[in-house]
Amino acid sequence: MTEFSPREIVSELDRYIVGHAEAKKAVAVALRNRWRRRRVPADLRDEVTPKNILLIGPTGVGKTEIARRLAKLAQAPFLKVEATKFTEVGYVGRDVDQIVRDLVESALAMVREKRRAAVKAKAEGGAEERILDALTGPGSTAARESFRKKLRAGELDDKEVELQLADTGGPSFDIPGQPGAAVFNLSDMMKSLGGGRTKTHKTTVSGAWAPLIAEESDKLLDQEALTQEALELAENHGIVFLDEIDKVASSSQRSGADVSREGVQRDLLPLIEGTTVSTKYGPVKTDHILFIASGAFHVAKPSDLLPELQGRLPIRVELKGLSRDDMRRILTEPEANLIRQHQALMATEEVTLVFTDEAIDALADAAVAVNGSVENIGARRLQTVMEKVVEEISFTAADRGGETVTIDAAYVQERVGALAANADLSRFIL
């Protein structure tokens, strides 16, 4: 779990996302409160529940990007799901309990990776012995030592070996009517009966290291303790980002078949409030899982959500639409901005791509103009405009090695000016 202060979290998010100070503060405080709760006296710890957040803002302003960056920062089990993927219990589709099961899988992967790193040195020794067994056979000590030296020197990396590895890719199937038994894997069942199957793999020595180290690490790990730690991590530090929550809100203007829209909201209520969900690793309490919901609310309004669900998302943050200045900053400020990405792509062909300040202004103007005349899709419009501008250069770059190509305002106008000005053309091309 990360120990960044709220200010550090915000400055970390600032490296990738332009503006939205209020939203960044809200998620930073929510993340820090997880750390604070662990230090509260034990009698109060269970009473301190996370304050769930609802992010409201037009499409393309950075709601999902905030979640993506937060996931990397949090160092906690994190799951991003679209609310539209779920259906009410009784309909064909995934039920909302699957969110918790996926979160547990994410926690399990995190804990396993951490534990594997701790036993990696020992596991490498076991993997080396198995590769030597495959190369020389179990006996022959003298030949084995000579091969060991060559193996460590990397001289045998391209040699092909045949290995017996655990078979993890057995067929999976659903068991209807079984709560928490969403998907069973035949290999898992065989393993639990004490008969784990193996499969012969042909690979090079260099390709054999990763699967062998993973397998040897798992032999050294206490699987039961690992599962318990993962369940505890998911319960106390899990974060779920529910995207497109507005798509399951029933708009007052929309009539007709409302298949399981409200039902999904009703199913989400106990999950967000706190319930116990059965998973194949054991029961998981959701009382302390942090939920961050987000939606554009173009058609529906936040008030169209069930009142009980609104009450369970107490912190509301509105993200403003992007201005022309924001668009310009998005092109230049984030660490992996679009201009830098395209320059790096062209550099692989030994073409130096230069954007003048006027060209950057023209790109921002074109994106704002098209957003205003057609559909406002926020910063995503910049990608469309940028692709149109560099299309010809990308196509001919392979034949222009060593050249420096300067993109100025006139070039941008030539490529997208007419399209941006003509609403009908923009509708289909930009």
UniProtKB/Swiss-Prot annotation:
GO terms for biological process: protein unfolding; proteolysis involved in protein catabolic process. InterPro entries: AAA+_ATPase, ATP-dep_Clp_protease_ClpX, ATPase_AAA_core, Clp_ATPase_C, HslU, P-loop_NTPase. It comes from the Bacteria. Its main location: cytoplasm. It is found in: Cytoplasm. Keywords: ATP-binding, Chaperone, Cytoplasm, Nucleotide-binding. GO terms for cellular component: HslUV protease complex. The keyword Cell cycle does not apply. ATP binds at residues 18, 60-65, 243, 308, 380. Pfam families: AAA, AAA_2, ClpB_D2-small. GO terms for molecular function: ATP binding; ATP hydrolysis activity; peptidase activity; proteasome-activating activity. ATPase subunit of a proteasome-like degradation complex; this subunit has chaperone activity. The binding of ATP and its subsequent hydrolysis by HslU are essential for unfolding of protein substrates subsequently hydrolyzed by HslV. HslU recognizes the N-terminal part of its protein substrates and unfolds these before they are guided to HslV for hydrolysis. Belongs to the ClpX chaperone family. HslU subfamily. A double ring-shaped homohexamer of HslV is capped on each side by a ring-shaped HslU homohexamer. The assembly of the HslU/HslV complex is dependent on binding of ATP. HAMAP family: HslU. This is ATP-dependent protease ATPase subunit HslU.
